[in-house]
């Protein structure tokens, strides 16, 4: 077989018997690395971020229906970052629920 070499075009400097394999790229054809989630180095960063994202605001479940619409709206309006409200169990509400369950059992007897 005859060895053909291209002198112009995409396959220049490549042998016709060897197909182009992009995963075996040369440094001249390699695009610069793009890292969208890379944090800037300290020397690049002018202002240190106070918040580490994602930001979660913990809100007690006992107040979720009573105050969520008014107080949470004010809290999120004054909070300088995008945040998610995460509900958590109050230690006080568990005692109240246990107490109410005991009362219900007494009433049923």
Swiss-Prot record:
Name of this chain's protein: Protein ripply2
Disulfide-linked positions: none
Keyword list, A-Z: Developmental protein, Nucleus
Record's compositionally biased regions (Basic and acidic residues): 30-42
Pfam families attached to this UniProt entry: Ripply
Tissue: First expressed in the paraxial mesoderm at the 90% epiboly stage, and subsequently confined to the presomitic mesoderm. Expressed in the rostral compartment of S-I and S-II.
Start and end residues of each stretch annotated as Disordered: 1-42, 88-109
Designated gene of the protein: ripply2
Classification via InterPro entries: Ripply_fam (IPR028127)
Family: Belongs to the ripply family.
């Amino acid at each position: 077989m005859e060895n053909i070499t291209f002198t112009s075009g995409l396959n220049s400097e490549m042998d016709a018997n060897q197909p182009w394999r992009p995963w075996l790229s040369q440094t001249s054809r390699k695009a610069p690395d793009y890292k969208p989630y890379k944090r800037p180095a300290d020397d690049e960063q002018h202002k240190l971020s106070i918040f580490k994202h994602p930001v979660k605001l913990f809100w007690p479940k006992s107040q979720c229906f009573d105050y969520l619409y008014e107080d949470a709206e004010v809290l999120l309006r004054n909070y300088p970052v995008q945040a998610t409200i995460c509900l958590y169990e109050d230690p006080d509400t568990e005692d109240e629920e246990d107490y109410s369950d005991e009362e219900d059992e007494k009433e049923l007897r």
